[in-house]
């Protein structure tokens, strides 16, 4: 059997993982906001973030290990990135290579459009096609915090051989 034959099931499997990731991030943001933590602030065009909170969040994401190649984009009401974790060789959302990922100041039309879409719809799932022929499609899940203070976008590649194997094993149980 080919992975292509199981593409809808495979995509649903990845979507479930991304949705869980996005919802757990928004839950952490909501909890911090409810506890009165200041997560980010703009002052005279300069961004300050709560590095303690976001470093802890990043550690939790890597420790969970549910996604091995992903991007997390957290933006505020200004539609600008306040925190980003880039862990893909190429990110269709930010249009960056992994080596370029430290630059949070870039305004990328794709990322801004997806943030706006999430704020407008309250949450969505979409496939991001690669900007060039040699790239791969990526699945994106967007969620907002309950009060609308932050938008969380999570993406991952749709080319995961290991994940395809897991899906195959659920469809075709093998007894060893």
Where are the regions a protein language model picked out?
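Alpha-helical transmembrane segments of integral membrane proteins
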Residues: 1-3, 171-176
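Juxtamembrane segments flanking the first transmembrane helix
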Residues: 1-81, 86-89
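Hydrophobic beta-strand residues in large extracellular and virion-surface proteins
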Residues: 25, 29, 72-74, 125-128, ...
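Membrane-proximal, non-catalytic sensory/regulatory domains of signal-transducing membrane proteins
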Residues: 86-149
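Helix-start (N-cap) segments at beta->loop->alpha junctions
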Residues: 145-148, 153-173
């Amino acid at each position: 059997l080919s992975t292509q034959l199981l593409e809808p099931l495979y995509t649903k499997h990845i979507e479930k993982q991304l949705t869980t990731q996005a919802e757990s991030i928004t839950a952490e943001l909501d909890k911090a906001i409810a506890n009165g933590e200041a997560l980010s602030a703009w002052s005279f065009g300069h961004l300050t973030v709560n590095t303690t909170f976001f470093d802890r969040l990043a550690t939790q994401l890597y420790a969970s290990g549910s996604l091995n190649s992903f991007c997390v984009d957290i933006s505020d009401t200004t539609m600008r990135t306040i925190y980003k974790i880039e862990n893909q060789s190429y990110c269709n959302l930010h249009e960056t290579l992994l080596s370029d990922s430290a630059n949070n100041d870039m305004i990328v039309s794709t990322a801004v459009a997806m943030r706006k879409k999430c704020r407008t719809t309250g949450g969505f799932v979409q496939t991001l096609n690669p900007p060039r022929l040699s790239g791969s499609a990526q699945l994106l899940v967007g969620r907002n915090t309950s009060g609308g203070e932050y938008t969380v976008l999570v993406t991952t590649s749709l080319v995961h051989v290991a994940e395809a194997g897991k899906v195959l094993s659920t469809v075709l149980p093998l007894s060893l």
